[in-house]
C-alpha cells in the first residue's frame, strides 16, 4: 500500500478546515493537539494556515478507558491549555483516528476545563475502524488496513507515515 504524503494532506486539510469554519461562522477558534502526533499535525496545520494562534496540548493518558488494561504511557506530561475553554470554538487535532477512544478521552478532559461552544475534530488519517461513534469534521485521508497493520507517524520535521506489519514484528 502506498501511503499519502503528510505535507500534501496538511495543505488540503488547511483548505478544508477554512471552508468548514467559514460555513459555521467561526472566525477565531482555539487549536488543541492531542499528544504526541496530534500536536505535530496541529503545528503543521497552523503553519499551513499562516495562523500564529497559541496551540494547546492535551495528554489524555489518565482519561483513556483502556488505562487499566494497557497501563500508563511512560512519558505522561501535563496538558497545557493557554486559553479558556468555556464558550470557545475549539479545533481538536489528532494524527490517526482508529477506535475513537483517544478522541473520547480528549473530549472528557476538555469538558473538565469548561464547556466549549463547539468542537471541530481534525485528523490526518481516519482508519475507518471505529469502535465508538466518532468521525472527523476534516480529514486528510481515509485508509483501510489489515487487522495486523498499523500506521505510525514520525516527526515533527518532516512528518512521515510508515506502515507497520505487526505479524512480522514478533
UniProtKB/Swiss-Prot annotation:
Residue ranges the record marks as coiled coil: none
Keywords (A to Z) from UniProt: Glycosyltransferase, Transcription, Transcription regulation, Transferase
GO MF assignments: uracil phosphoribosyltransferase activity
Chain ranges for the short sequence motif PRPP-binding as given in the UniProt record: 90-102
Name of the top EC class for this enzyme: transferase
One biological process term in Gene Ontology: regulation of DNA-templated transcription
Enzyme Commission identifier(s): 2.4.2.9
Record-linked Pfam families: Pribosyltran
Family annotation (InterPro entries): PRibTrfase_dom, PRTase-like, PyrR, PyrR_bifunctional
UniProt catalytic activity: UMP + diphosphate = 5-phospho-alpha-D-ribose 1-diphosphate + uracil
Entry similarity comment: Belongs to the purine/pyrimidine phosphoribosyltransferase family. PyrR subfamily.
Role this protein plays: Regulates the transcription of the pyrimidine nucleotide (pyr) operon in response to exogenous pyrimidines.
PANTHER family: BIFUNCTIONAL PROTEIN PYRR
The protein's name in its UniProt record: Bifunctional protein PyrR
Native species: Pseudomonas syringae pv. syringae (strain B728a)
Amino acid at each position: 500500500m502506498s501511503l499519502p504524503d503528510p505535507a500534501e494532506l496538511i495543505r488540503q486539510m488547511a483548505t478544508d478546515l477554512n471552508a468548514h469554519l467559514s460555513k459555521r461562522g467561526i472566525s477565531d477558534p482555539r487549536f488543541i493537539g492531542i499528544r504526541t502526533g496530534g500536536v505535530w499535525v496541529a503545528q503543521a496545520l497552523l503553519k499551513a494556515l499562516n495562523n500564529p494562534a497559541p496551540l494547546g496540548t492535551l495528554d489524555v493518558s489518565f482519561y483513556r478507558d483502556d488505562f487499566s488494561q494497557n497501563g500508563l504511557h511512560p512519558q505522561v506530561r501535563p496538558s497545557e491549555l493557554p486559553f479558556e475553554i468555556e464558550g470557545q470554538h475549539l479545533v481538536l487535532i489528532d494524527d490517526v483516528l482508529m477506535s475513537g477512544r483517544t478522541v473520547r478521552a480528549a473530549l472528557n478532559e476538555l469538558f473538565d476545563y469548561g464547556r466549549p461552544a463547539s468542537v471541530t475534530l481534525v485528523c490526518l488519517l481516519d482508519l475507518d475502524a471505529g469502535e465508538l461513534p466518532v468521525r472527523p469534521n476534516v480529514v486528510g485521508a481515509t485508509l483501510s488496513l489489515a487487522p495486523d497493520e498499523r500506521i505510525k507517524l514520525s516527526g515533527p520535521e518532516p512528518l512521515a507515515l510508515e506502515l507497520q506489519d505487526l505479524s512480522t514484528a514478533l
